[in-house]
Structure formats: structure tokens, C-alpha cells
Amino acid sequence: MDIEKIKREIEELKRQKNAIIVAHNYQIDEIQEIADFVGDSFYLSKVCAERTEDVIVFCGVHFMAESAKILSPQKKVLLPEIDAGCPLADMITEEDVDSLKEKYPDYSIVCYINSPAAVKAKSDVICTSSNAVKIVRNFPNDKIIFLPDKNLGSFVKKQVPEKDIILWEGFCITHYKIKKEDVLKAKEAHPEALLLVHPECRPEVVELADFVGSTKQIIDFATSSKAKEFIIGTEMGILYSLKKRNPDKKFYILHPGMICPNMKKNTLESVRNALLYDRYEINIEENVVEGARKALLKMLELS
């Protein structure tokens, strides 16, 4: 495989199609290197809403590409690997939301962006890991159903104790691998290092952290910190940006299993093929787009 040749082809196809490539922080290094924008879900949501290009190639997982389409329905949104899904997003359905609304009519639905478009469409507002606390705190209803991630929900609940928050039982299978024992071992091995974790981690892991935040917030914290060593409790794709921005600092992944197999499905070849063959295009029913867009725009308003 001639990597440089594929990169040149991607650049040429981008010009021809008036396209941009956006990539999540968990993507493989080669994709982050060629992307026009790299970041967390919230940052990429704003990018997709604001850019004027005709085509968005979203290097992430399915729900992220859906969100890009919802915010920019007039644009062509391509997901290089159509089977790049998210087990967490699959833990909630629109039927589940209907049941919750029937059971708790006075509660508002705050939906984590890691969810299907049809679920977003039935929610009152969307949030990301970077703004979940702010969204719940600023939302005008004190009765909240937070879905689908129970760990992020637990983190929010602790930060906003004045609100009545019901949690759904979903979780990220990658972050869920980290246990308290892993943290204690890592801290023993690297006593000078600060522990930075994602709020999708278990509550007992989050409690031991020096900083809790989204991938972008973790990168920003490590970059601005005077500390020289960090234990990182999130998917290892984040190491690319951490090391690039902080070549003089040391980073240790908290658990060797911190790899999201779905995030790693996108490759340079599949990005090239996405642009070459217009695949795989994200299409969403108009009524779903309308409801989900309203909830996503509410997020941008409240944050």
C-alpha cells in the first residue's frame, strides 16, 4: 500500500468534491493526520454546522455522521465504514423513550449524543461529554431523564445534585473495562502522574481522577498543565493529539484494552473510497431530522 499516493488522491478528491474531512480523537493516527478538523463530539458538531463545503467525510462512528447530517441536512455526509457502529448507542431505542415518557410525563429527556437519530428526535435536548453538566444545569426542568450512558449520567448527577435525575442503564463497553484496581496499580507505577479520565468511566474510577472531561478537555488540560506525566483513562486514539501537542510530556494509558474497535474501522483507503464513490452516504427520514435537529440546536443554545 502506497500511503503517500493515497493521501495525494484524498487531497485531490477533496478539491474536486468541495469536501472536508472531520475526525474524532479516537481515530487511527493516519486519519487524524489527514483530517481538516480533529476533536470531540461537541467540537465536530459545531464544525459541521458552520462549514460551507458540500461534502462532509465523517471519520468516526455512525451516530456522529448522523449528527452531522442532522445539523447540515443540505450537505452530503459520508461515513467511510458503514458498519462503524456504537454499542452504547444501540442500548436505547425510540420505543424505550416512548415508554419513559409515558411512565414519567413530568420529566424532560436529556440525551447523550452517543445515540441513534430516532432517539434524539424524541428527546428535549442533546448533550456531549464536554457540556452535559452545563446542559442539565441550564435546562428549565428540574426533573430529568438522562440517557443512554449511566456513567456520564452519574457524573452529571453528582455535579447537579439539586435536580431529580433518572438514569438509563447504558454504558460504553470500552470505558467500562477500567476498574478501581487498574487505577490503583497505575498510580502506584506512576506516582507523579495526574489521572485524567473520561466521564464514561465507572463512578469509582471518576472519583479517583485529578481531572474528568471529554477528549478535547483532556487534551487541553494536559497541554496547559505544568505536570509532566499523565495517566489517561480513555480510548488510546487520544494519544496522537496528546503527544503531538506535548512532545516533552509522558502519557500512560490506564488499561491496555482501551481500544474502540468501531472507531478503528476507518482507514485511509476507506476515506479515499468514500470520496471516490460517494459512500457511504447518510440519509435520515425528514421527520426524524426535524425533531433531532431541534434537540441539537437546543444543545448549542444552552451551551
From Swiss-Prot:
Entry-linked InterPro entries: NadA, NadA_sf, Quinolinate_synth_type2
Catalytic class of the enzyme: transferase
Disulfide bonds: none
GO cellular component: cytosol
Keyword Iron: yes
Cofactor(s) required for function per UniProt: [4Fe-4S] cluster
Subcellular location: Cytoplasm
Positions bound to iminosuccinate: 24, 41, 112-114, 129, 198-200, 215
GO molecular function: 4 iron, 4 sulfur cluster binding; metal ion binding; quinolinate synthetase A activity
Residue numbers binding [4Fe-4S] cluster: 86, 172, 260
The organism's place on the tree of life at top rank: Bacteria
GO biological process: 'de novo' NAD biosynthetic process from L-aspartate
Record field: catalytic activity: iminosuccinate + dihydroxyacetone phosphate = quinolinate + phosphate + 2 H2O + H(+)
Main subcellular localisation: cytoplasm
Family annotation (SUPFAM superfamilies): NadA-like
Pathway membership: Cofactor biosynthesis; NAD(+) biosynthesis; quinolinate from iminoaspartate: step 1/1
Note on cofactor: Binds 1 [4Fe-4S] cluster per subunit.
Known EC number: 2.5.1.72
Keywords: 4Fe-4S, Cytoplasm, Iron, Iron-sulfur, Metal-binding, Pyridine nucleotide biosynthesis, Transferase
Family: Belongs to the quinolinate synthase family. Type 2 subfamily.
Stated role: Catalyzes the condensation of iminoaspartate with dihydroxyacetone phosphate to form quinolinate.
Cited PANTHER family: QUINOLINATE SYNTHASE, CHLOROPLASTIC, QUINOLINATE SYNTHETASE A
Protein name: Quinolinate synthase
